[in-house]
Every structure is written in structure tokens, then in C-alpha cells.
Amino acid sequence: MSFIDPYQHIIVEHHYSHKFTVVVLRATKVTKGTFGDMLDTPDPYVELFISSTPDSRKRTRHFNNDINPVWNETFEFILDPNQENILEITLMDANYVMDETLGTTTFPISSMKVGEKKQVPFIFNQVTEMILEMSLEVCSSPDLRFSMALCDQEKAFRQQRKENIKENMKKLLGPKNSEGLHSTRDVPVVAILGSGGGFRAMVGFSGVMKALYESGILDCATYIAGLSGSTWYMSTLYSHPDFPEKGPEEINKELMKNVSHNPLLLLTPQKIKRYVESLWRKKSSGQPVTFTDIFGMLIGETLIHNRMNTTLSSLKEKVNTGQCPLPLFTCLHVKPDVSELMFADWVEFSPFEIGMAKYGTFMAPDLFGSKFFMGTVVKKYEENPLHFLMGVWGSAFSILFNRVLGVSGSQSKGSTMEEELENITAKHIVSNDSSDSDDESQGPKGTEHEEAEREYQNDNQASWVQRMLMALVSDSALFNTREGRAGKVHNFMLGLNLNTSYPMSPLRDFTMQESLDEDELDAAVADPDEFEQIYEPLDVKSKKIHVVDSGLTFNLPYPLILRPQRGVDLIISFDFSARPSDSSPPFKELLLAEKWAKMNKLPFPKIDPYVFDREGLKECYVFKPKNPDVEKDCPTIIHFVLANINFRKYKAPGVPRETNEEKEIADFDIFDDPESPFSTFNFQYPNQAFKRLHDLMYFNTLNNIDVIKNAIVESIEYRRQNPSRCSVSLSSVEARRFFNKEFLSKPTA
């Protein structure tokens, strides 16, 4: 049964760009002047330049010794119609050393009307005539999707997944507990969340996923969302050719073998040369390269070394029939001069789309990193491999890469890696350099002759590769500074008009109109300035943006799951975040997520941190809406923490440990162990350490399966009592109309 999606009727404001097409047809009587023609016959080509647009400089091929060349070459420019756009046309003569300018003229594009197409002659040096054919049209089909709604692919996935989940829940819960599942509308949306925490999070999440897979809970989940270390496990699992036919158990054995090696083995001269040459190809194509690219390669070589060409788009085959939960990954967009706790835009990644819900702006995964202007691709690159994204999602570790490898002795005494990571701010990792400019707008007119250009490029490549090799194998500034370590990509929102950002819950803003406790919002969880600037927009004039590890703001990927469009009923979160000790309260990240949700007017159950004082440390805690009749959209949260409690006594739920060996293997601390085998920055896990952490989280999850099942049963009943959940109602339509009127009546900047 289909229903109306109210979010698809909310208009995300954007201006259309113009596409200006130039066909360089021909020229006659090309001359270098009387004296010049006596010495040499021209080798002409044409260069086109529009300073107001990215990818602004284009050129034709050149013809040797031809004074009447016929090029018939077509070029396209994407223009902002609100700017003054001038086409600069330069006739060039190709030479071996340096090309010569034969003449330059300009054409005001504003003199053309939309829909007009005409041929225009241009005269150079009173003799040469060049004919260009030009046309101007509106780009009515941008490459970005502007919408508050989920994409059609995700909607189709959800429908298919619900059909599967309906049968899976009946099997999991039995006839009595699943009698409320009459149709797919009764199926609750269950999401699984994994936190950051380096390899500790990855290994712990591997045990969790094994338990969820074997217990049948995974078959009942619609989403699985990860951050930093958890995304590495998700990437490993979903990119594996045998998943889901082969379960996590076999894949986890491969993972244990892969992480048992010293990461320094990845830095052999032969491997480094291969990494750097690959990065050179990326850099020379016009894409930014940072240390995060290198870190992504190292993570990829460790975890998915036999599938380094895998892309995010290719993971669609794992979910195209709803056979697996949809994986969601995340990073942050940050500003160079603002703490990420104050300002950060959450970027979400799925096999279907990448984008920022805050701006209602999304793109196909293969376009991430391409050069955009006003929502249209002006230069497309190959899709970034999955390992590059893995480096971005966990880029906090590239920031302190010297600590990861243990190659620097410069760290301050008494400083733990966790403490050092907590002190990182955006200004430490984002270089405010001048490389934001485009090469084509900076370079002089003309280029060297092709042979000279190749020679120059080869020399430049050799020099760049040599510098990178020296930086990686020596104790250089690259290891000892943090600036420039953040991931960097072309700004896909360049040139858009952002008069305002959009609320994460647009319909809720106007239908609920509930009063928020200002004292609650002002209370600091980790920092007095946390989330102070989260309503501010991205800089649409910056040609590149910095993307970093989401754990630098808070370490749980709740923003992906709390989007009201996803209508999640039950969230099962697993927090592997570092704590001062095993006995420390485990709610810091969850409290930050709660505050973020309230500031964005998103429903979130009240997190009572004093439950720790009353009940002590437990394997999991359940948080429900206090007034379910009023908080109809509020999810239930089952929050698992990293704690070794019952695992010390039981080798399986209800099965006591008996032998000394069984007791000894389970007698360990996570954060109080002085040798820190589970440190956030430990990137080598011996088999015993892997098995301990993996088996601990496997046990903790299975030990609380009944808690999860009971929550699913309650969610089914909750759905049955609230059939209008996430579907349209009269109040929603009115809210949508009010929303459009409120936000679209504002004057443009």
C-alpha cells in the first residue's frame, strides 16, 4: 500500500544555472604578422576563458602549419546568470618552448537571450576571421537533487525491505508476539548504530554483527549506521563478495588475520611508491590530495586489500532487493577557523546517495569529488574508491598518524592518545591555504607544446613523488604537523544560493510548536560552546570543502538515523567510545546526541545520566519516551556500552565458565589495563586481543537478545496504535504549505 510522502512537497530553494555552449568552427588567414609569417607558419589553436565559472579555461587542439584551420570543437560552460559573464577568446600559436598569443577579444554573454543560437565572427589583427557558434539555455535538470525527501531508490528499498522484515519478525518473535503484523505498515523501522573508536570499535562491532546475524535481529533491521571505526567494519562486511550468503563469522576470521600485522609493514618502499604514484594521478587530474588519501590507502590495504577498486556505488548490489539493512556512513564538513563542536555539517553516505540533509542537497555517489557549479557537474572524475571514503570517515587517525604508527618520540609525557584526540579542533587539521584556487584560472594564457608539457609533467611528478616518499619514510614535517591532514574535496555546493539552512524536522517545527527547555539546551555536556553555530550555512563561495571524522563532534551517528523521513522506531546503539576507566559513566556521547537532537527539534527520549548512579554499570540501558501518547514520533533506544561484566563469569548466556583457562581468557579490563591493548590508537590486534574484544561484544549482545525482542514487540504495538506515523495528514499538509511560504518568501541574497 503506497502513501503520500509529505517531504517531497517541501520545496528546497535553488537557482537554475545557464549552460553556455561554444562551438569553435574555423578560422581563415591566421597570421603572425608579416615578419612572423616569413619565419614560420602558424600552428593555431583557440583558448576560451570565462573567469566567473569553475573549469573556466578550455582550448582546442592545434594544427601544424595551417592558416585556415577547421576545428569544429564544442565546449560547455555552466554560468550563474546573476553574474556578469564575459567570454575571452584568445588565438594562440603553439611553439615548442612557450606558446605565443596572436590576439585576444571578448564577448559579453549577457547580450544573448536564453534559447538563442547564433554564429558570431571575430576579427584578429584586422586580417584573421574566426567563426564561433554560441547558444545559451537553462540547466533545468541539475546533477544535484534538491529535496527534503528520501531518494526514490531508498524508498523502493524500504518497501522491499519491509516485505522481508515482516516475515523475518514473525519467525523471530513467534506467532503470539507477532500477531500485530498484519501488513508492512505495521512493521517497525529498526536501526543499528556503531560508534567510533578506531580498531576497538571495528573489532567490537564485528562481534556485535555476528550476534545480530545469528540471532535473526539483523534480518529485522532496516538501517545500519556507522561512524569512524564502525564504518571500517561495515565497509569490510558489505564489500565482501560472499556477504550476506556468508555470515560475519567467516568474514571476522579474515579480519582477525588482517589486523594481526604491524601497520608499519604497509610502509615498505615498494608499497609507498605505489601509493604515492596513485595519488599523483589523482592530483594531476585536478583533484585535491591530502594525507587522508594516504591514510585511506593504508586502511584499505589492511582491511580490503583484495578489493581496493570497490566503490560505494557497488554496494547497491547488497541491498537492491532489500536483502540486507541499508548501510549509512558519515563524516563532517568543518570550517578552518571554527571548532567542530561549534559548527559541523553532517554528511551522509549510502550506496544510493551522498549529501547533507541540512541543505536538502544530495548527489549520486559517483559524483562525490567531482567539480560542481550551481548544482551541475562541470568536471566529472572517476568515483572515489571505498578506501578513500574509509580514510575520510576515520580521518581523526590520519591527524595523529605518528601516534598510530608509534614513529614519533615528540609526544608530551603523560598525554594519552585519547586525551590528545579530544584536544584536536578543526583549526589543527584544516589548512587555510591558497590551494582553493583553480589551476585553470591562475595559469598564464596558453600552454607549452605537448612534448614540452609532457616533459614538464614528468619532472613535476618525479619531484612530487620524491617529496612524498621522503615525507613518509623520514621524520619530516608531514609526520610532525597536523595542518592539512583533513580530507578535501571539491565543494559540490559551490555557487548555490543558501539564504537559509533547512530544519532537520521541517514538518515538526510547525505541527508540534512545543516549548523547549532553554536551560536544558544551554547545559553543556562537553564544552560551553558546543553546537553554538550549527544553524549557520556552509560557505558556497569556497571551491573546496574539508571533510573529517564525525567523532570529532560526538561519537555516535544519530543524525543519520534521526531524520524524520526515515521514521525509525527502535534504535540499537553500540558505543565503543573511550572512557577514563571501566567504571566511568558511559553516557557522554549519548548526551551530546540528545542535545543535538533537541536543538534540531528532533524527537529523542530523555537520557537520565543518573541511572548509572542508581543501577551501576550494565551491558545495556533502555531509554523510552516518557509520554508515548504525546511523543508519537519518539524512538526507543537500547544503548549498549563496552563493559566486561557477565562475560567474566559466563562463556555463553547462562553457561558458566568452569576451567581456569576459561576464566583467565575473560578476566580483562578495557580501559584500566596499563598496557592499553584496546587503545583507540592501537592498529595491531594480536589474535588473543581480537578474540577477547570480539567475543565480549558477541556475548553482551546475545545476553540481551530478549531485551531487543521485547522492544521490537513494543514497537509493533506502537506502530499499530499510530498508523499515521510517517504518512501524510491534514496538519502535515498545512505545515508543508506554511513551511514553503515561510522559507521561500525570503528575499534572495
Curated annotation (Swiss-Prot):
Notes on how activity is controlled: Activated by cytosolic calcium, which is necessary for binding to membrane lipids. Activated by phosphorylation in response to mitogenic stimuli.
Modification Phosphoserine occurs at: 2, 434-435, 437, 505, 515, 727, 729
Modification Phosphothreonine, positions: 268
Pfam families with a match to the protein in the record: C2, PLA2_B
SS bonds (residue pairs): none
Keywords, sorted A to Z: Calcium, Cytoplasm, Fatty acid biosynthesis, Fatty acid metabolism, Glycerol metabolism, Golgi apparatus, Hydrolase, Isopeptide bond, Leukotriene biosynthesis, Lipid biosynthesis, Lipid degradation, Lipid metabolism, Lipid-binding, Membrane, Metal-binding, Nucleus, Phospholipid degradation, Phospholipid metabolism, Phosphoprotein, Prostaglandin biosynthesis, Prostaglandin metabolism, Ubl conjugation
Enzyme class: hydrolase
Active site: 228 (nucleophile), 549 (proton acceptor)
The enzyme's E.C. designation: 3.1.1.4, 3.1.1.5
Region of interest (Phospholipid binding), ranges: 1-178
Positions annotated to bind Ca(2+) 1: 40-41, 43, 65
Known catalytic reactions: a 1,2-diacyl-sn-glycero-3-phosphocholine + H2O = a 1-acyl-sn-glycero-3-phosphocholine + a fatty acid + H(+); a 1-O-alkyl-2-acyl-sn-glycero-3-phosphocholine + H2O = a 1-O-alkyl-sn-glycero-3-phosphocholine + a fatty acid + H(+); a 1-acyl-sn-glycero-3-phosphocholine + H2O = sn-glycerol 3-phosphocholine + a fatty acid + H(+); 1-hexadecanoyl-2-(5Z,8Z,11Z,14Z-eicosatetraenoyl)-sn-glycero-3-phosphocholine + H2O = 1-hexadecanoyl-sn-glycero-3-phosphocholine + (5Z,8Z,11Z,14Z)-eicosatetraenoate + H(+)
Location in the cell: Cytoplasm; Golgi apparatus membrane; Nucleus envelope
Entry comment describing in which tissues the protein is expressed: Detected in granulosa cells after stimulation with chorionic gonadotropin (at protein level).
Basic and acidic residues bias: start-end ranges: 446-457
SUPFAM superfamilies per UniProt: C2 domain (Calcium/lipid-binding domain, CaLB) (SSF49562), FabD/lysophospholipase-like (SSF52151)
Region of interest (Disordered), residue spans: 426-458
InterPro entries, per database record: Acyl_Trfase/lysoPLipase, C2_cPLA2, C2_dom, C2_domain_sf, LysoPLipase_cat_dom
GO molecular function: calcium ion binding; calcium-dependent phospholipase A2 activity; calcium-dependent phospholipid binding; ceramide 1-phosphate binding; lysophospholipase activity; O-acyltransferase activity; phosphatidylinositol-3-phosphate binding; phosphatidylinositol-4-phosphate binding
PANTHER family linked to this entry: CYTOSOLIC PHOSPHOLIPASE A2
UniProt subunit comment: Interacts with KAT5.
UniProt domain comment: The N-terminal C2 domain associates with lipid membranes upon calcium binding. It modulates enzyme activity by presenting the active site to its substrate in response to elevations of cytosolic calcium. In the presence of phosphoinositides, regulates phospholipase A2 and lysophospholipase activities in a calcium-independent way.
Functional note: Has primarily calcium-dependent phospholipase and lysophospholipase activities, with a major role in membrane lipid remodeling and biosynthesis of lipid mediators of the inflammatory response. Plays an important role in embryo implantation and parturition through its ability to trigger prostanoid production. Preferentially hydrolyzes the ester bond of the fatty acyl group attached at sn-2 position of phospholipids (phospholipase A2 activity).
The protein's name: Cytosolic phospholipase A2
Organism: Bos taurus (Bovine)
